[in-house]
């Protein structure tokens, strides 16, 4: 059996895995931009930034597969391609470079020390540390993370408490159009739904370690510990969004990191900014090391390349992309995430109820239809839209909520279920 203490410890471990310091830049700006609509915006953000990652872990628990096999019921070939794209997204193409860029910008850029020389020196040192600890099994970085994360959480708590209860700032009464859609799509940027599938095995192994539990008990343990993580994340994200909404009357900026830094400075003074820079940089560093190790282990398991070579290549690519800066990396990620997230969310939903779905063609239909809509929305985000694609997106139900793909996914499910209802559960290659 397990105790309440075990649930809390596992819950906070899951919280630490899903809580990326780099994700702190999103809630304040969402609150700042949406003003009195901040609560609806954050509800949507929490659904995609917190809820779906939790469901991702549950779906892996139910399906019994890791990320390499997560989409096997579509086809083994598709599953492998899906896994590669997902690992690249949370690895050298998006997430890892963003950790370096975030750490640099919070430390230097918005503290009056902007310089190309500082940037290159900082990022070289940053990724030098990443590659050093990724190549060598060492518990030092874990210990650093265990020290910095609590300090960061205390600092965040102080910012939230002071911003909410000890300031006389009021939220602007403006109503933001499409507030839910804004938050829902911004939640994609956390990339935690993708990461949750990759990390699910670690959490599941931790639950089973040293315990004799039935499958039902394991699932109950996971749900309860997951709720601890979800509530913790929701409180932090929601608190920062509310503080951001109140900052509109005293701060003028359109930059996410600048808003976070100036908010901290306004509420806690210069020393608060210094502590924020140290803690966020350290947290980003530990996140980057974990992601680089994940990329190295994944590609060394499916290719003939050695772990060390993959790590070096991953860090080099991440360094080069980090030079672009946080906003540029976010802009690059938008069309990619808009395309792959509908497919990922669909697969999570299907795997959650997989034992009730006897026909693998249903998986193919849902992925096909949601993938097409995701591709259209991706092209639209790049400005490659036309009259016909715009017309398709406009007539689809739930498009105002960022759920343009939902109705096509349901159609794909029904259509392929009827077309192949006599098909047995088989695994075909594309």
Model-derived segments and spans:
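Hydrophobic alpha-helical segments and their helix-loop junctions in multi-pass secondary transporters
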Residues: 92-96, 153-176, 193-194, 241-245, ...
